[in-house]
């Protein structure tokens, strides 16, 4: 089972104590800029799981997401 872990400027996807993906972001004013999305195993939905976590975190903390990386852009276009 994949666990989401929030750290400063990073959201990690962990499985069996191993990082299987991460999002790197920056915060400024009311904006959360998604800089990079990494999923170390493709086809498992890890990137989407991370983006879902980022969207939820941004909403809870009243940030607007600015998708810098192409994965974040494509994910948000679908929503």
Predicted regions and their residues:
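Conserved beta-hairpin
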Residues: 9-20
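Active-site rim helix/loop that mediates acceptor-substrate recognition in acyltransferases
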Residues: 1-10
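Conserved beta-strand in the GNAT
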Residues: 18-26, 33
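Residue-level signal for tight coil/turn positions that link beta-strands
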Residues: 8, 27-29
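A short, internal acetyl-CoA/4′-phosphopantetheine-binding micro-motif in the GNAT/acyltransferase core
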Residues: 36-43
């Amino acid at each position: 089972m994949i666990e989401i872990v929030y750290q400063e400027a990073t959201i990690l996807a962990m499985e069996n104590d191993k990082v299987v993906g991460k999002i790197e972001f920056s915060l400024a004013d009311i904006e959360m800029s998604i800089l990079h999305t990494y999923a170390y195993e493709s086809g498992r939905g890890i990137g989407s799981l991370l983006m879902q976590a980022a969207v939820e975190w941004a909403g809870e903390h009243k940030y607007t997401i600015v998708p810098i990386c192409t994965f974040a852009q494509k994910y948000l276009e679908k929503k």
